[in-house]
Amino acid sequence: MSRIGKLAIPVPAGATVTVAGQTIKVKGPKGELELVLPEVITPKFDNNELSVNPRADLIQAANDVIEAETAKGKRPPTFAQSLSQDARTQWGTARARAANMVEGVTKGYSKTLELVGVGYRAQMQGVDLKLALGYSHDVIYKAPQGIKIEAPKPTEIIISGADKQAVGQVAAEIKKFRPPEPYKGKGIRLQGEYVRRKEGKKK
């Protein structure tokens, strides 16, 4: 089987998992998430472990391929190699997304943005983010449901939530308001992000 896909996902105390058909619901202290898997993947929750595997008929077909190659005296393919490319891809993706859900509802995800530039600052306006970025007007960003935004200091923004993809998406959207420019490095960047600098034109 796929090295990633075949691994069961341990579900820690404090989190609950419900499986109904192709739908996985995970609930924990950081929130609640839902994932609908493609038809080629079957989820299972047992003994505090969540697993996702190819559908039964696909497993049988892959095993038939292995047996046929073995009967011919050939070196048999691995289980993953016996699956279609589409099934392999969806298997690994489904496992990764399910693992991210469990991690998200128990520990959560966060990204920190830094504002670099004279006069650039961030502050909260209720639950919305207010940004001064050198424009003639302030920028107001409304946090989507399930995402928390904080501005502990004027040059720092913390984005957190249970959904890893949503946290990353919000960080990307905020960065777009003032991407780091390559000459002076001014703009909004991820904490620790390297901004490649260009040398300005010499007079």
UniProtKB/Swiss-Prot annotation:
HAMAP family: Ribosomal_uL6_B. It comes from the Bacteria. It holds the Pfam family Ribosomal_L6. Keywords: Ribonucleoprotein, Ribosomal protein, RNA-binding, rRNA-binding. The gene is rplF. This is Large ribosomal subunit protein uL6. InterPro entries: Ribosomal_uL6-like, Ribosomal_uL6-like_a/b-dom_sf, Ribosomal_uL6_a/b-dom, Ribosomal_uL6_bac-type, Ribosomal_uL6_CS. Part of the 50S ribosomal subunit. GO terms for cellular component: cytosolic large ribosomal subunit. Belongs to the universal ribosomal protein uL6 family. PROSITE patterns: RIBOSOMAL_L6_1. GO terms for biological process: cytoplasmic translation. GO terms for molecular function: rRNA binding; structural constituent of ribosome. It comes from Hyphomonas neptunium (strain ATCC 15444). This protein binds to the 23S rRNA, and is important in its secondary structure. It is located near the subunit interface in the base of the L7/L12 stalk, and near the tRNA binding site of the peptidyltransferase center. PANTHER family: 60S/50S RIBOSOMAL PROTEIN L6/L9, LARGE RIBOSOMAL SUBUNIT PROTEIN UL6M. SUPFAM superfamilies: Ribosomal protein L6.
